[in-house]
């Protein structure tokens, strides 16, 4: 998971903590007689269909001893589940090879309502022992462009937050399952092998006043390790619109050191090319096809006027993310 160094940080999911066998059944059906409608939705859709175990009711045994965590409300958990379904699982289901989502996406997910409050930093999430934990669910807000109370600045804040704090994390984590099955290509590693900073991934660039983009990393966090480099590149490329990606490449189009052979842009574009070849060779996955579908859905959240037609936007607004899908019946009160 990629940290954010503003009001909160997101603890990384090191490769040793992400070892979940994608072929091993994770989800076990439970007795539905005492379940809420949302719990049935989790079991019948996410569990049975994608073999993912999702928990949103607070369980002390799953909470970190290092951070203070609060429970997620069921209404907010439902928003997150629907956002995840629309921008992540349905994307893979529609355009990825058959069975890809079941084998190569997140397997265990725990939702908490608050930030992880700690003595030195506040966390947006972590991934202990392969169990992805997402915090701050109670502050998730999914804006609608044509809402009566629409205000551009507020809308853009919530849209960017929903995309960059929640959706990108899902793609980042799914990338870790890929390199666990098939290691990151050596050619990818060699491009910046001497510049990985491990636990100094943030302080190194900040102290020197250098953009990690110019060194060939899509984010400061990507410089932590080859595995996080791979996952950050995958997740970021997947959610950014083409013009946003190009803007990053323009910022990266400088040499990190005077004697550097390549600019950061050249390194990043080479890494991306290697990643694309790797995904096609090992998983028959065309990342540009998946990205186009992800962009289509995410773009609908931002502004339907950016789309060639309004089809995607109307598809988006037909689904109220605060409610269960039509095949379920919700008794959850409006917030």
Located regions from the model:
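C-terminal motif of bacterial Sec signal peptides marking the signal peptidase cleavage site
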Residues: 8-12
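Active-site-flanking segments in enzyme catalytic domains
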Residues: 141-272, 276-283, 287-290, 297-298, ...
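Short, charged, low-hydrophobicity "junction" segments
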Residues: 52-64, 106-113, 203-213
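Generic detector of contiguous secondary-structure segments
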Residues: 65-66, 70-73, 118-120, 217-224
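Acidic/polar, low-complexity intrinsically disordered N-terminal segments immediately downstream
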Residues: 13-101, 261, 268-335
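Auxiliary, metal-adjacent structural segments of Zn-dependent hydrolase domains
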Residues: 18, 78-139
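Bacterial N-terminal signal peptides that target proteins for export
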Residues: 1-2
